[in-house]
Amino acid sequence: MRTFVLVGIMLLAAAPGAPVRAQTNPFLGRWDITATTAKETYPLWLEVREENGQLVGFFQERTGSVRKLPEIAREGSELVFSTGAPARQGAPKPVHRAHIEKGKLVGTLTRGEVTVPWVGVRPPTWKSANASAAHTFGPEIVLFNGKDLSGWTLQFPNQPGGWVVTDGVLTNEKAGNNIISTQRFKDFSLSMEYKLEKDSNSGLYLRGRYELQVLDDAGKPPALGGHMAVYGRVVPSVNASKPAGEWQTAEITLVGNRVTVVLNGQKVHDNVAIDGITGGALDSDEGAPGPIMIQGDHSKIWVRHLVVKPIK
């Protein structure tokens, strides 16, 4: 994922002098959103909080990282918010309007004359879990066989793949496509050996929804966009990266929305909670099994070992 830039944004009041009552506000909490256009569906994510009597919102667009909303308010039976200035100068400002319908958050994104409908549902009620605990595993599943791309598909089938296997190592010779495992997983442990080129930027998506950043940043302080960060959401406790060109090992366990990561023998995440999807997620159906996805549309990565052990 592109290097994370944390931007502080001033919150606009929900309504001057009119505090929002939590007990009468059905918008509060988290929402897993699916937007639908004529050509595709794509995931979004929203969290609405009440702080000091005013609404505060956090939004995950289809790419990038979760950000605080600059504008959010309740207007009668509707929730209205904007993600801020348009992506390019002169473009119309994006505005979201939503209402509650049979327990769902039903909304639209409007940019000038373009309107995109979307529907949000509540995320799963995650059971108490400890990704760092001892687990009982099923048989190992070798996702990379060292020979070819059996068991993998392209995220964008109509675009060049760019992935090849040479001397038992999987690599993306040309940036441009992500690869997705054909198998889906619920709770699991994953073991991967990989290396990066200088300044390389890639990512590993768990269940296709939660990105662990893969970045050449050895020697730098841990960051929201640093190596093995839950991209834009959780900073690693330590940067355990090796320099570019050296083989690295990652041992990752995902149980519910809890993740533990050991990078090069050092624990960098210890049963941390993932609040929601990250940018680039395949969907927002957090309760469903999902694939492993390796990002190949940014920079070069080499992978020589990739094994998943499902948790019973």
Where are these regions (language model features)?
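Bacterial N-terminal signal peptides
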Residues: 5-15
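Sec/Tat signal peptide C-region and signal peptidase I cleavage site
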Residues: 17-22
